[in-house]
Amino acid sequence: MVKIVIPKEIKEVLDKILENGFEAYLVGGAVRDYMLHRRSNDFDIATNALPADIIKIFGPSYKTIQYGCYNMRIGSYNVDITTYRKEEAYEGRNPSKITYTNNLLLDAERRDFTINAFYMNRNEEIIDLYDGQKDIKRKMIRAIGNPTTRVREDPLRILR
Protein backbone atom coordinates (compact mmCIF):
# COMPACT_ATOMS: atom_id res chain seq x y z
CA MET A 1 0.00 0.00 0.00
CA VAL A 2 1.34 3.43 -0.95
CA LYS A 3 1.76 5.88 1.90
CA ILE A 4 0.13 9.21 1.12
CA VAL A 5 2.00 12.21 2.45
CA ILE A 6 0.65 15.64 3.19
CA PRO A 7 1.80 17.94 0.37
CA LYS A 8 4.69 20.26 1.18
CA GLU A 9 2.56 23.29 0.25
CA ILE A 10 -0.08 22.34 2.81
CA LYS A 11 2.53 21.80 5.53
CA GLU A 12 3.84 25.29 4.72
CA VAL A 13 0.38 26.75 5.38
CA LEU A 14 0.25 24.92 8.73
CA ASP A 15 3.77 26.16 9.53
CA LYS A 16 2.85 29.81 8.86
CA ILE A 17 -0.07 29.59 11.27
CA LEU A 18 2.04 27.82 13.91
CA GLU A 19 4.91 30.32 13.51
CA ASN A 20 2.46 33.10 14.38
CA GLY A 21 1.64 31.45 17.71
CA PHE A 22 -1.61 29.71 16.82
CA GLU A 23 -2.75 26.10 16.72
CA ALA A 24 -3.33 24.54 13.30
CA TYR A 25 -4.73 21.13 12.38
CA LEU A 26 -5.82 19.49 9.18
CA VAL A 27 -9.37 18.35 9.77
CA GLY A 28 -12.19 16.48 8.11
CA GLY A 29 -12.29 14.66 4.82
CA ALA A 30 -8.64 15.20 3.87
CA VAL A 31 -7.55 13.46 7.07
CA ARG A 32 -10.03 10.65 6.48
CA ASP A 33 -8.73 10.28 2.93
CA TYR A 34 -5.14 10.29 4.23
CA MET A 35 -6.02 7.42 6.58
CA LEU A 36 -7.58 5.52 3.67
CA HIS A 37 -4.47 6.17 1.52
CA ARG A 38 -6.39 8.39 -0.89
CA ARG A 39 -5.13 11.64 -2.32
CA SER A 40 -7.03 14.86 -1.73
CA ASN A 41 -6.91 18.27 -3.36
CA ASP A 42 -9.21 19.85 -0.75
CA PHE A 43 -7.75 20.63 2.65
CA ASP A 44 -9.53 22.07 5.67
CA ILE A 45 -7.46 23.60 8.44
CA ALA A 46 -8.91 24.35 11.88
CA THR A 47 -7.19 26.95 14.05
CA ASN A 48 -7.69 29.14 17.08
CA ALA A 49 -6.54 32.13 14.98
CA LEU A 50 -9.34 34.59 14.32
CA PRO A 51 -10.19 35.57 10.72
CA ALA A 52 -8.36 38.90 11.17
CA ASP A 53 -5.25 36.97 12.26
CA ILE A 54 -5.45 34.73 9.18
CA ILE A 55 -5.72 37.79 6.93
CA LYS A 56 -2.61 39.27 8.61
CA ILE A 57 -0.72 36.03 7.95
CA PHE A 58 -1.86 35.31 4.37
CA GLY A 59 -3.28 38.59 3.06
CA PRO A 60 -6.82 39.20 1.80
CA SER A 61 -8.77 36.21 0.50
CA TYR A 62 -10.30 36.22 -2.95
CA LYS A 63 -13.56 35.20 -1.27
CA THR A 64 -15.50 36.95 1.45
CA ILE A 65 -14.83 35.36 4.82
CA GLN A 66 -18.05 33.80 6.05
CA TYR A 67 -18.54 31.72 9.16
CA GLY A 68 -14.88 32.22 10.05
CA CYS A 69 -13.68 30.47 6.88
CA TYR A 70 -10.79 31.83 4.79
CA ASN A 71 -10.31 30.25 1.36
CA MET A 72 -7.15 30.10 -0.71
CA ARG A 73 -5.77 28.18 -3.68
CA ILE A 74 -2.22 26.89 -3.76
CA GLY A 75 -1.51 25.32 -7.13
CA SER A 76 -4.10 22.56 -7.55
CA TYR A 77 -5.03 22.58 -3.86
CA ASN A 78 -8.08 24.26 -2.37
CA VAL A 79 -7.49 25.25 1.26
CA ASP A 80 -10.13 26.43 3.75
CA ILE A 81 -8.82 27.82 7.04
CA THR A 82 -11.54 28.03 9.67
CA THR A 83 -11.47 29.43 13.18
CA TYR A 84 -12.56 27.01 15.92
CA ARG A 85 -16.21 27.74 16.54
CA LYS A 86 -19.48 26.72 18.10
CA GLU A 87 -22.66 26.85 16.05
CA GLU A 88 -26.24 27.50 17.06
CA ALA A 89 -29.49 26.51 15.35
CA TYR A 90 -29.38 26.34 11.58
CA GLU A 91 -31.31 28.51 9.13
CA GLY A 92 -31.31 26.50 5.94
CA ARG A 93 -27.84 25.02 5.49
CA ASN A 94 -26.05 27.66 7.58
CA PRO A 95 -25.85 28.27 11.32
CA SER A 96 -27.91 31.19 12.62
CA LYS A 97 -25.04 32.19 14.89
CA ILE A 98 -21.42 31.21 15.33
CA THR A 99 -19.18 31.90 18.30
CA TYR A 100 -15.41 31.68 17.95
CA THR A 101 -13.63 29.63 20.57
CA ASN A 102 -10.08 28.67 21.53
CA ASN A 103 -11.25 25.15 22.32
CA LEU A 104 -10.67 22.36 19.81
CA LEU A 105 -13.10 20.11 21.71
CA LEU A 106 -15.95 22.61 21.23
CA ASP A 107 -15.06 22.88 17.54
CA ALA A 108 -15.22 19.09 17.21
CA GLU A 109 -18.77 18.98 18.58
CA ARG A 110 -20.09 20.73 15.46
CA ARG A 111 -18.62 18.18 13.04
CA ASP A 112 -21.08 15.98 11.18
CA PHE A 113 -19.74 12.42 11.31
CA THR A 114 -17.07 10.63 13.34
CA ILE A 115 -15.14 9.81 10.16
CA ASN A 116 -14.91 13.54 9.38
CA ALA A 117 -13.91 14.67 12.87
CA PHE A 118 -10.21 13.80 12.81
CA TYR A 119 -7.66 16.49 13.59
CA MET A 120 -4.11 15.97 12.33
CA ASN A 121 -1.14 18.10 13.32
CA ARG A 122 1.80 19.08 11.16
CA ASN A 123 3.67 15.91 12.22
CA GLU A 124 0.80 13.75 10.94
CA GLU A 125 -0.32 12.75 14.45
CA ILE A 126 -4.07 12.19 14.52
CA ILE A 127 -6.52 13.22 17.24
CA ASP A 128 -9.61 10.99 17.10
CA LEU A 129 -12.12 12.25 19.68
CA TYR A 130 -15.07 10.14 18.49
CA ASP A 131 -13.54 6.74 17.60
CA GLY A 132 -13.79 7.49 13.90
CA GLN A 133 -10.95 5.08 13.14
CA LYS A 134 -13.08 2.22 14.47
CA ASP A 135 -15.98 3.41 12.31
CA ILE A 136 -13.75 3.41 9.22
CA LYS A 137 -12.70 -0.18 9.96
CA ARG A 138 -16.36 -1.15 10.42
CA LYS A 139 -17.35 0.82 7.28
CA MET A 140 -19.85 2.69 9.43
CA ILE A 141 -21.03 6.29 9.18
CA ARG A 142 -22.00 7.57 12.62
CA ALA A 143 -23.21 11.07 13.43
CA ILE A 144 -21.75 13.21 16.17
CA GLY A 145 -24.68 14.08 18.38
CA ASN A 146 -28.24 13.51 17.22
CA PRO A 147 -28.25 12.05 13.67
CA THR A 148 -31.62 13.59 12.80
CA THR A 149 -30.40 17.02 13.87
CA ARG A 150 -27.18 16.66 11.86
CA VAL A 151 -29.06 15.79 8.67
CA ARG A 152 -31.65 18.55 9.20
CA GLU A 153 -28.84 21.08 9.65
CA ASP A 154 -27.50 20.23 6.20
CA PRO A 155 -29.31 17.55 4.15
CA LEU A 156 -26.39 17.45 1.67
CA ARG A 157 -24.29 15.76 4.36
CA ILE A 158 -25.90 12.47 3.39
CA LEU A 159 -24.61 12.81 -0.17
CA ARG A 160 -21.03 13.79 0.61
Q: Model-found features: residue ranges?
A:
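Catalytic cores of the polymerase beta-like nucleotidyltransferase superfamily
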Residues: 1-160
